[in-house]
Amino acid sequence: MSHQPLSCLTEKGDSSCETPGNGPSNMVHPNLDTFTPEELLQQMKELLVENHQLKEAMKLNNQAMKGRFEELSAWTEKQKEERQLFEIQSKEAKERLKALSHENERLKEELGKLKEKSERPFEDITGRCGFPRTDLEQEVEQLKRQVEQEVEHLKIQVRRLQAEKADLLGIVSELQLKLNSGGSSEDSFVEIRMTEGEAEGAMKEMRNSAGPTRTDSISMGKCTEDARTCVEFEELTVSQLLLCLREGNQKVERLEIALREAKERISDFEKKANGHSAIETQTEGSTQKEEEDKDPESVGIEVETLNVQVASLFKELQEAHTKLSEAELMKKRLQEKCQALERKNSATPSELNEKQELVYSNRKLELQVESMRSEIKMEQAKTEEEKSRLATLQATHDKLLQEHNKALRTIEELTKQQAEKVDKVQLQELSEKLELAEQALASKQLQMDEMKQTIAKQEEDLETMAVLRAQMEVYCSDFHAERAAREKIHEEKEQLALQLAILLKENNDFEDGGSRQSLMEMQCRHGARTSDSDQQAYLFQRGAEDMSWQHGQQPRSIPIHSCPKCGEVLPDIDTLQIHVMDCII
């Protein structure tokens, strides 16, 4: 904030403009002769302290305005979220309508098939009749869940309204405290104005030592403007509170409408549940009827609790309206006080510029608030459109449910008529199946007896096999021992045979050498020589006789490979092993 200087000093020390920079010219100033310089300094210090306090109050008001703006932005975000929830609910309702339409078409197709096949015997009617009943039960459960979800949603909205109401009541109480302290602030403003006049008179007398005091007088002028801005901010806060309370009233009205719609839906669902319970008592019995009667009772209790909450909300809203009227009265009083202050204080050009800036900023804020309101209205219109769509979807849903119920009734009637015809055929078929089952059981019992006998025989065979295996192990061990002993004997016999063969060869060689020497000696003695042919024949015959004699003198070979059990002689050890295994077994 800028102010005109209180005194324009010349080179000689005189003032070129004697008019003060703030305050009217016709205002009577007190005589400064009665005040001492110390008292003037004390008053200046007090004014500085008050100026500092006013600045802090302005900062707090600015922070409060920022908080209000943030709350408004958060509220708009909540509205957007609610709108998204409504859109999701509308989509779900559309999907349910599609599913119901598909089910209705399927039931119509089944009706057509039943009408076409009414002349023929049916075997699987009971299996088909179970599906629509289960579908009906599922739909009833889904509708009950929807009602419970809507009731919970309404409860959440009521809690939100209660919290908002508590916040608004706290804000109103704070404003009342500020307004109660407003009277003392006005008195302080008047005192500030009086001290400003006194300070200006003192400054005219003390021009040479007026360096630091000029800044103090300028700050005094700023205090009045700070007070005006404080009042304007308080007016803005009051107006914003009024808007918030009006919006709260609108929310309560919407909730009342939603509660009425929920009550209507609950009544419709109760009627439908009663209808379904009447149908199910004819088919299933009294147990399910008691379970279905409990659900509407619980829904009715929840509706009564909601009605009580709505009544309490109405009472709280009436109290809020009374507090709003009190706040409006306080606003009028503040406006009157502001007008009185404006009349007292004459505006300078610099103050006018500052006021214009403040007005411009206030208009900007108002435009922002209006834009927010327009957005909120648009969102409210969209939500209302979505509600209307939901209402139309619910109407179509009710129609489809009625058609579904009619189709189910016709199906049940047809199934009852055809069940009476099919009972006799089913009894005959069941009797035949029983006979076949008894025959199959008898044959299976015979097979079981035969299997038991075979199992007993196999167990006996297994026992004998175990004994035989033990005997085989004993025989095998004995056979391996005998085989090892025989192999040793055979090796010894082979060694002896080799030694005999060597000795026989040596003996033959020795005998041949001796016979030749004797022949040579005989030839030399006798000197008679026969012809070569006769001599050769004689020698040949004698050699043959010697060979036969040698063969006659050789020992006969004893049979080695013979069976120990039966005594049969075999040529090889392998054949002997095979024979022994067969002979023992």
UniProtKB/Swiss-Prot annotation:
Residues 415-585 are annotated as: Interaction with HD. Phosphorylated by TBK1, leading to restrict bacterial proliferation in case of infection. This is Optineurin. The lineage of its organism: Eukaryota, Metazoa, Chordata, Craniata, Vertebrata. Residues 1-32, 200-220, 269-299 are annotated as: Disordered. Zn(2+) binds at residues 563, 566, 579, 583. Residues 38-181, 244-512 form a coiled coil. Residues 416-525 are annotated as: Interaction with MYO6. One of its GO terms (molecular function) is K63-linked polyubiquitin modification-dependent protein binding. It comes from Rattus norvegicus. The gene is Optn.
